[in-house]
Amino acid sequence: MPSLHVFYGGTFDPVHVGHLAIARAAHAALQAPIALIPSADPPHRPTPGSSSMDRLRMLQLAVSKEPGLSADPRELQRAARQNRSSYTVDTLTEVRSELGPKTSIIWLLGADAFVNLSNWKDWQMLPELTHLVIANRPGITLQTQLPPKMATVFNHRWVQDPATLRKTPHGHLWLLNQHPNPSSASKVRAAISAAAHWEADLTPEVAQYIRTHGLYGIHDIN
């Protein structure tokens, strides 16, 4: 079976059970390991609420007992070396250079991120570097919510069978139909600051890390 390299990018601020559910579903559907890549401060989103090293450590803790999942620090390391903004297209260009032109590469992202892809740097280049696997999210219908300029680039690229992704190195889109989890990082952060229940949305190891390191203002509510 041809090899398949799958990368799941995000701020993971913090990583929660919804992220892990998507990664597990992709691992099962694609029969390939999933490398989760925490982004440096993303230019198109607010600055993360915890440091890059905290986000990486929480991600490492979250995947430590998850077969087939790993944390990949390459984007944080590159941002630290170059001291500049973080862009997915740069990460994928680096990955493509490492793996060569014939290797099948997948970038995994949620539907909520995908519908805003036109805000990303050089987003039109992504199909030349990778396949895109989009995890469905509640309330988002991709067929009707894509801006016209995105529809022009992507609508002819959808495939029904994920096996197709192994046959070519890049250029296709596939919808990962998984049971959407309502967890979100913003809700977790808000719950912590409001002294509401938040632990159920995280693994025990990540919850303990937040307590130990006083992240997201938790010391203010103890």
Swiss-Prot record:
Coiled coil: none annotated. GO terms for biological process: NAD biosynthetic process. Its EC number is 2.7.7.18. Pathway: Cofactor biosynthesis; NAD(+) biosynthesis; deamido-NAD(+) from nicotinate D-ribonucleotide: step 1/1. The keyword NAD applies. The keyword Zinc does not apply. It holds the Pfam family CTP_transf_like. It catalyses: nicotinate beta-D-ribonucleotide + ATP + H(+) = deamido-NAD(+) + diphosphate. GO terms for molecular function: ATP binding; nicotinate-nucleotide adenylyltransferase activity. Keywords: ATP-binding, NAD, Nucleotide-binding, Nucleotidyltransferase, Pyridine nucleotide biosynthesis, Transferase. It comes from the Bacteria. Catalyzes the reversible adenylation of nicotinate mononucleotide (NaMN) to nicotinic acid adenine dinucleotide (NaAD). HAMAP family: NaMN_adenylyltr. Belongs to the NadD family. This is Probable nicotinate-nucleotide adenylyltransferase. The lineage of its organism: Bacteria, Pseudomonadati, Pseudomonadota, Gammaproteobacteria, Lysobacterales.
